Amino acid sequence: IVTVDCSDYPKPVCTLDYMPLCGSDNTTYSNKCNFCNAVVDSNGTITLSHFGKC
């Protein structure tokens, strides 16, 4: 199982770094920060599907 540590999120501003992650909602997030903010917003219902684009 692939996991990402989102314990230090949410962050108010994310960098523009592009290291895509695919969420369980079938959305490609541009980087860990954007993904983790979405995880927090979803109360943990979104999980990491895999690294890279969906």
UniProtKB/Swiss-Prot annotation:
Where does the UniProt annotation locate this protein?
Answer: Secreted
Residues with an annotated glycan are N43
Matches recorded under PROSITE patterns: KAZAL_1, KAZAL_2
SS bond list: C6-C36, C14-C33, C22-C54
What are the residue positions of the site described as Reactive bond 3? L16, D17
What keywords appear on the UniProt entry? Answer: Disulfide bond, Glycoprotein, Protease inhibitor, Repeat, Secreted, Serine protease inhibitor
Q: What is its main location?
A: secreted
**Per its record, how is this protein called by name?**
Ovomucoid
Q: Which organism is it from?
A: Turdus merula
Source organism phylogeny: Eukaryota, Metazoa, Chordata, Craniata, Vertebrata
